[in-house]
A protein has these predicted regions:
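Catalytic phosphate/metal-binding cores of nucleic-acid and nucleotide-processing enzymes, i.e., regions
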Residues: 1-152
Length: 152
């Protein structure tokens, strides 16, 4: 099925985001290592059992960029769409990964994910992704109960 024929969803936003990443690997060679973690999705009972045996876990973020930048050791992005919110397991995972030194955020669009990824890639030294310029430019906010950056 062509992307243009698909109804807009988390899946289409993730496809658009990963297409952008693949098309910018010449500009940002480290994007070669960005990847989707297939922990979600609906599977039949047999396939779900096999994936669980293989190590699939609930709550793991959608996208991993295991490349250190600024003060971070890597980046996790959870993509959502519409009114979807992170599950309790996703919030725990994001908090744990932040404590381990990763930058973690929830993005509600491919465009938002691209913007925060570009900001992350361009970090230098011990820089963080929570300065005023980031707030102004990327509509950065931390959800009061989740404690995780949310990018629109």
């Amino acid at each position: 099925m062509k992307l243009a024929d698909m109804k807009r969803s988390e899946d289409t936003e993730q496809i658009l985001f990963m297409q952008w990443c693949r098309s910018h690997e010449d500009e940002y060679p480290q994007l070669h290592w960005i990847h989707h973690i297939p922990n979600g999705g609906n599977r039949n009972r047999k396939e779900a059992a096999k994936f669980k045996q293989m190590g699939v876990k609930a709550g793991i973020a959608d996208i991993c960029f295991p490349y250190p930048k600024g003060r971070y050791v890597g980046m996790y992005i959870e993509l959502k769409y519409g009114d979807n919110i992170p599950t309790p397991q996703q919030r725990v995972f994001m908090r744990e990964m932040e404590l381990a030194g990763h930058y973690c955020c929830i993005c509600y669009s491919a465009a938002g994910a691209v913007r925060v990824l570009q900001e992350y890639i361009n970090l230098s030294g011990g820089a963080e992704l929570n300065g005023a310029s980031f707030e102004e430019e990327f509509e950065y906010r931390v959800h009061k109960t989740w404690g995780i950056p949310v990018i629109n």
